[in-house]
């Protein structure tokens, strides 16, 4: 019985799957089994997988007669896994040679930890370095997946938290990590890069990006109490979650009351009034997108960047804060904050100090 089971699901992955398989075969740790799940590919994926299985007895191949999509393909693979430790990888990514060895060593040493993840590097299609993945952050996990693609967990985890959810296709891994954190309260982290994550051009279509965004919102709505409990003292993450759920209409009265209790300044965040002119706070890309949505209702922009303030955006003036204070009329105007969530807190505070009683955030119209 192998110590580690690796599941490799693939659908039409013939272009890079050899590199992915070779990265497993070339591991310094050798007590593994690789279970390749061909998810009804129409290219040469199955042929390549079977070629490797004939040469290497540690490799098994499962062929799905119908396409099951990633969550169920993973579940099928793990139902055939016999290892003490479990992991999975993708057909276009690669382990560095010591990845399995180091993760096994960590789990062997830290018996209390259910799972470990490591750093990884983003690469382009030709495996040229692009950038380093953000480090695992247990607090940030409440609003964003920071586990990455190199990880390993104990077989008991599968028994305790169950299989991957088909409902959360596209964010099935993040949802699984949340269940692990709810059950065990921690995930171990090795601050070394043991994985190469290939970012292919045009691989993230508009439709897929939109689904990921919607699934993340649904995920945070489903686990709202857990998410909010871990970020009550972090206003930037509170605003991130608020904006995300607001954009997808997931904020009901209960959630709004919760947000306002934690951050009273959100009581002033209101829907836009069609009868009032809009001043867009933020003359960047989000500000331009806001203008495209509102057009004739927009009076001006506001920005603290000296390179933008005093100029024009979309044919309208870009005010300084002093000009906003001078020209703003509560009866005729309203402010739409159109910057990233992590920049909103300072703006909200400045509006309150200026006596502007309410505002809206861009998520309301995005």
Where are these regions (language model features)?
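Cell-envelope/extracellular polymer assembly enzymes that use nucleotide-activated donors
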Residues: 2-5, 33, 175
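Conserved nucleotide-sugar donor-binding catalytic segment
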Residues: 79, 135-226, 232-238
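Hydrophobic, well-ordered beta-alpha structural blocks that scaffold small-molecule cofactor pockets
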Residues: 231-366
